[in-house]
Amino acid sequence: MERAVPLAVPLGQTEVFQALQRLHMTIFSQSVSPCGKFLAAGNNYGQIAIFSLSSALSSEAKEESKKPVVTFQAHDGPVYSMVSTDRHLLSAGDGEVKAWLWAEMLKKGCKELWRRQPPYRTSLEVPEINALLLVPKENSLILAGGDCQLHTMDLETGTFTRVLRGHTDYIHCLALRERSPEVLSGGEDGAVRLWDLRTAKEVQTIEVYKHEECSRPHNGRWIGCLATDSDWMVCGGGPALTLWHLRSSTPTTIFPIRAPQKHVTFYQDLILSAGQGRCVNQWQLSGELKAQVPGSSPGLLSLSLNQQPAAPECKVLTAAGNSCRVDVFTNLGYRAFSLSF
């Protein structure tokens, strides 16, 4: 007579809750530490996890090396965006941005240094902050999101110094033209707007969906991602992923991908994009698809390139989105492994 296989011991309530959290997790944002050896990831539960890239990439790495060094509750709602200065990690959620000291987080002391809320129109308004952008030359931070405005904060004093108005719906993404003091913003209204930081005025508007070759009405007009490289911009979302010549406001390359893209970046002579679907796409500027590299998440929301010169051994691409995992690509050709909350 066969022996009955004993049932698994029921998990405790905490373990069940954590397993359900991981099952329904979305990772919205990532940021590399100033030393290049650590990666912060922010999720839909308001948690930030700090991973040790140097440990995970080591030849002696174990499964435990791919788990967070520390995880802490940073916001009440999702952590939509993060950036790092030479000392701080800045994180944004619903209505406010917070600062954390990298040195303290790595010692597992996760106490916020400060928090700031932009001057919203009413005290009842708590719009999400979808995008953060550092402007190193003026030591400032630009925040944008659900109130359809760009707010500039002086990082030295913590005061808000300017508001840029023009979008008619919420803003998804920001990019900096480093050679000129200009910022690009893309939003739900289907427009990419260029702002001159010297005059605090809008100097150019590209309504992408109005260009027939880019328009995809069934996907909507929203702009979910953009990046710039001097005179060139690439953007996507509802409309097709498109490379634009900024001076002439003309689309030069339409990239042949149907799925809406949520993140895009220039890398050397390539453009990297990700969105609906599990692949990181590598494009030639001509529009040719060089490679599609599958990851472990069904959809991707965030790409991060670690190019910190202080840690060349940690030079990796990381991708995250609709799962509890952060995929690590040690070269662009394949996924080496995944970090996990």
Curated annotation (Swiss-Prot):
Pfam families: WD40 (PF00400). GO terms for biological process: apoptotic process; central nervous system development; mRNA export from nucleus; mRNA processing; RNA splicing. The modification Phosphoserine is found at S180. WD repeats lie at residues 22-61, 74-112, 124-165, 166-205, 215-254, 256-293, 295-339. It is found in: Nucleus; Nucleus speckle. SUPFAM superfamilies: WD40 repeat-like. InterPro entries: THOC6 (IPR042626), WD40/YVTN_repeat-like_dom_sf (IPR015943), WD40_repeat_CS (IPR019775), WD40_repeat_dom_sf (IPR036322), WD40_rpt (IPR001680). The keyword Transmembrane does not apply. One of its GO terms (molecular function) is RNA binding. One of its GO terms (cellular component) is nucleoplasm. Keywords: Apoptosis, Developmental protein, Disease variant, Intellectual disability, mRNA processing, mRNA splicing, mRNA transport, Nucleus, Phosphoprotein, Repeat, RNA-binding, Transport, WD repeat. The keyword Transmembrane does not apply. It is linked to Beaulieu-Boycott-Innes syndrome: An autosomal recessive neurodevelopmental disorder characterized by delayed development, moderate intellectual disability, and dysmorphic facial features. Other developmental anomalies, such as cardiac and renal defects, may also occur. Belongs to the WD repeat THOC6 family. Component of the THO subcomplex, which is composed of THOC1, THOC2, THOC3, THOC5, THOC6 and THOC7. The THO subcomplex interacts with DDX39B to form the THO-DDX39B complex which multimerizes into a 28-subunit tetrameric assembly. Component of the transcription/export (TREX) complex at least composed of ALYREF/THOC4, DDX39B, SARNP/CIP29, CHTOP and the THO subcomplex; in the complex interacts with THOC5; together with THOC5 and THOC7, plays a key structural role in the oligomerization of the THO-DDX39B complex. TREX seems to have a dynamic structure involving ATP-dependent remodeling. Component of the THO subcomplex of the TREX complex which is thought to couple mRNA transcription, processing and nuclear export, and which specifically associates with spliced mRNA and not with unspliced pre-mRNA. Plays a key structural role in the oligomerization of the THO-DDX39B complex. (Microbial infection) The TREX complex is essential for the export of Kaposi's sarcoma-associated herpesvirus (KSHV) intronless mRNAs and infectious virus production. This is THO complex subunit 6. The gene is THOC6.
